[in-house]
C-alpha cells in the first residue's frame, strides 16, 4: 500500500479559525475575519501579538477542542481503505500540545492506529509517498510528493500541487482506486 501522510494543524484541524477567533475576541484590533482569509497571521499581527498568541497556544487545552476541517473524517476514512495513512504533526514548538493533539486524533480519527501517529519537529524524517501539509517548509524537506493544503499563509506559493478542501483530496487520491 502507498503511504499517505497528513499534517494535523490546518489540514485535519481548523487551527487557523480558532486563532482568528481568539484574535478577534481577545485582542485589540481593527482587523476583521475577511482580513485573515487573505493573509497569514505573521503578516497581519504585531510581533507582540504573535508572542501572546504563541503563549496561548502553549497552554494545556488549546489543541483539545479545535474543529475538524469539513469532510476530513469521511475522506480520511475512505482513503484508509486504499492507503496506509499516517499523521505527522509538530508538537515540539508547543510542548504542552502533545496530550491534546493525541487525544484529539484518537477522538476524531479512531481508525488511524496510534502507531501511525508521528510527533516530530522536522518532517524530513517522514518516509512516505505523499505528504499533505499547509507549510511549504515541510514539503521542501520531504522526499516524496508534497501537496500543499491551502491556508491564508500560503496563498502566494506556486511550487506545489495544491488542494483547498477535503473534496479536492478525495478527487486527487480516490479517483485512481
Give names to the regions the model predicted.
Residues 84-86, 130, 147:
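A structural signal for isolated positions on well-ordered beta-strands in alpha/beta enzyme cores
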Residues 55-87, 94-99:
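Short, acidic loop-to-helix structural element flanking the phosphoryl-transfer center
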Residues 88-141:
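Substrate-recognition "cap/lid" segment bordering the active-site pocket of phosphatases
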Residues 4, 79, 124-125:
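Structural alpha-helical scaffold elements that stabilize or flank donor/cofactor-binding regions
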Residues 168-177:
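Short amphipathic alpha-helix with an adjacent loop that forms part of the alpha/beta core around
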Residues 132-167:
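Acidic, Mg2+-coordinating phosphoryl-transfer loop and its flanking beta/alpha structural elements
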Residues 1-51:
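Active-site neighborhood of HAD-like aspartate-dependent phosphohydrolases
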Amino acid at each position: 500500500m502507498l503511504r499517505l501522510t497528513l499534517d494535523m494543524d490546518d489540514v485535519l484541524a481548523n487551527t487557523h479559525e480558532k486563532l482568528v477567533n481568539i484574535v478577534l475576541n481577545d485582542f485589540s484590533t481593527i482587523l476583521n475575519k475577511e482580513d485573515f482569509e487573505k493573509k497569514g497571521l505573521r503578516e497581519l499581527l504585531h510581533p507582540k501579538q504573535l508572542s501572546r498568541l504563541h503563549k496561548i497556544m502553549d497552554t494545556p487545552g488549546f489543541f483539545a477542542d479545535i474543529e475538524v476541517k469539513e469532510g476530513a473524517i469521511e475522506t480520511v476514512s475512505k482513503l484508509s481503505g486504499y492507503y496506509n495513512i499516517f499523521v505527522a504533526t509538530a508538537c515540539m514548538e508547543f510542548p504542552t500540545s502533545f496530550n491534546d493533539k493525541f487525544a484529539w486524533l484518537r477522538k476524531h480519527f479512531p481508525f488511524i492506529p496510534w502507531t501511525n501517529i508521528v510527533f516530530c519537529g522536522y518532517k524530513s524524517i517522514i518516509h512516505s509517498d505523499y505528504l499533505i501539509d499547509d507549510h511549504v517548509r515541510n514539503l521542501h524537506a520531504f522526499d516524496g510528493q508534497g501537496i500543499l493544503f491551502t491556508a491564508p499563509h500560503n496563498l502566494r506559493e506556486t511550487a506545489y500541487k495544491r488542494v483547498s478542501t477535503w473534496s479536492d483530496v478525495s478527487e486527487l487520491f480516490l479517483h485512481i482506486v
